[in-house]
Design a protein with these regions (language model features):
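Bacterial N-terminal signal peptides
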Residues: 1-9
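Conserved beta-alpha junction segments in alpha/beta enzyme cores
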Residues: 13-158, 165-339, 345, 352-531
């Protein structure tokens, strides 16, 4: 959740460093750039898998004092120690919630956590960043930096959507006119991705895999849906790997849908939020002080955030119960992050240890990928990029409408089906429950009534991974789009979401692209008529 206090009100959707023509350039004005399609299926073969993690936590050079206690940098009120002697305050601006929130300390490392999965034909890498978002242009840049000798055929870079780490998009600088991106930190982030993938390739080991689905159960209290209709993406999905010879755990991918914002907007410490506790709990142990509550599984955990639009989050006043201490926690703090993270970790540990699911040493990647354009009708995005220049994203124009380029991937490996989505998907698109509420702006638009979980191949375990290879903001059903009065569900003001989306057609465009991937007919988009 990115606060409207960011001023530009385009939230988690809009940063990139150079892809395609600038918005001023009228290139092919009468037609979209053709989609780029990649389809490649490997035969089932022996698997090799490697895992690695690299911290990219910045060193805080300048210390500062929040004199008035408002969790924001106020020049002339707050004070700082000029650690590098350059005469200015050099802050690392925390992304999410509001601008002007520089880090005061480091609570725990932020990391690039990687797995590389090789079937002998295709070598596909996944890297998860403890970041709010990482733009498609940045992903393309890292792909170019990967040495060809690594043999990686596809690199996926995912952001957990962490709201307590330095800005990698540009929206959360010291004020509306300044980017929040520190160039050195951006470079360190990219290096961490490359280093993690390089190490994971070096650790490729003959492996066996299996998948698990962990029913949400008690985890339900850790997440709220803050916008009607109330639809969740509840379960935890796990892809496990073990050494084919020794049977020792190598690592796993864990996928769950909940915004990492347990600390909320007054926190000033860099942290991975609850996903850090998920990883440490599973990989090492669940420990409180000197007391170990549960042994971990070993190996390395890659945490991938799911369909979190709508908005699925541990909202500031949400009461959660720590299953190990039985403490009920309402205040946003590290105890809340720990309760959520260790709760998820415990559910995965128990499911893994109790599972009789068969392991498989052979599988083959079936990759179906599309790169395409999406209309960017949120004019604040264009202003932020082209006028204020606090973010960097390029556009093409077609018939006067700006477009961005993004990508969508359906990746199958045995029983595991990954849908790599470029933004924050509303869970009703994934699971069903899309509505046409009274007061919606486009009631005659095509209703997304075929849930994506039914659209992609059935059987096995589905991993819906948000903020993958881009961060284009909320992916909203057009029939629920609501910027204009009268507002839906009897609200007196517009709901949260639209100002953090690149446009009302985003959900329709992505639905069309997924239909093309799975060879389904693409229906008409319906009418723009509001009546």
């Amino acid at each position: 959740m990115a606060s409207l206090a960011c001023g530009l009100a385009i939230g988690c959707s809009n940063a990139n460093y150079s892809r395609g023509p600038a918005v001023e350039d009228e290139v092919d004005p009468d037609a979209l750039v053709p989609d780029v399609v990649v389809e490649k299926q490997s035969p089932a073969a022996a698997l090799r898998v490697g895992f690695a993690r690299k911290a990219y936590t910045p060193v805080l050079v300048d210390a500062w004092v929040d004199v008035n206690g408002n969790a924001k940098w106020d020049p002339g009120v707050d004070t700082f120690t000029d650690g590098n002697g350059n005469g200015v305050f050099d802050g690392y601006w925390l992304a999410g919630f509001s601008q002007g929130r520089p880090a005061q300390s480091v609570h725990d490392d932020i990391e690039a956590v990687a797995t590389v999965i090789d079937d002998g034909t295709q070598r596909i890498a996944f890297v998860a960043l403890d970041a709010i978002g990482f733009m498609n242009g940045e992903v393309e840049d890292v792909r170019k930096q990967l040495p060809a000798s690594l043999g990686v055929t596809l690199l996926n870079v995912h952001s957990t959507h962490n709201h307590e780490a330095p800005d990698l998009q540009g929206l959360w600088g010291k004020d509306f006119g300044n980017t929040g991106i520190d160039p050195a930190h951006m470079a360190a982030t990219k290096k961490a991705i490359v280093d993690a993938v390089t190490e994971a390739v070096g650790k490729l080991t003959a492996a066996e895999m299996r998948t698990l689905t962990v029913p949400q159960g008690a985890l339900a209290e850790y997440v709220a849906d803050t916008r009607s209709p109330e639809v969740f993406d509840p379960d935890v999905h796990v892809l496990e790997f073990r050494d084919a010879a020794s049977k020792a755990p190598l690592g796993r991918v864990v996928n769950w849908s909940n915004h990492p914002e347990a600390l909320w907007g007054s926190n000033l410490a860099i942290t991975a939020d609850y996903p850090g506790y998920v990883r440490r709990g599973i990989d090492e142990s669940i420990t409180y002080g000197s007391e170990k509550k549960m042994d971990g599984l070993g190996g390395v955990t890659v945490f991938l955030t799911g369909a979190i639009g709508g908005l699925l989050c541990p909202r500031g006043n949400l009461e959660v119960t720590d299953r190990f201490t039985q403490e009920k926690i309402t205040t946003p703090n590290f105890e809340k992050a720990r309760a959520i993270g260790y709760g998820v970790a415990a559910s995965v540990i128990e499911a893994s240890k109790g599972s009789n699911a068969a392991w498989s040493a052979q599988a083959g990647w079936n990759r179906r990928s599309r790169t395409f354009e999406v209309p960017a009708t949120n004019q604040k995005l264009v202003i932020a990029a082209q006028v204020l220049k606090i973010i960097k994203r390029d556009f093409a124009r077609h018939l006067g409408v700006p477009y961005i380029t993004t990508e969508l991937h359906l990746l199958e490996l045995g029983d595991a089906k990954f849908l790599m989505m470029p933004g924050e998907l509303y869970p009703e698109i994934a699971n069903g429950g899309v509505t046409v509420p009274a007061g919606a702006d486009y009631p005659k638009a095509r209703k997304l009534d075929l849930p994506w979980r039914q659209m992609i191949p059935q059987g096995g375990t589905q991993f819906f991974v948000g903020l993958s290879n881009d961060a284009i903001g909320y992916i909203i059903p057009k029939t629920q789009w609501d910027e204009l009065a009268p507002y839906t569900y009897g609200d007196t003001e517009p709901p949260y979401g639209e100002t953090n989306s690149i446009g009302a057609d985003t959900g329709l465009v992505l639905d069309e692209q997924l239909r093309k991937i799975v060879k389904l007919p693409v229906p008409d988009r319906g009418s723009e008529d509001p009546n």
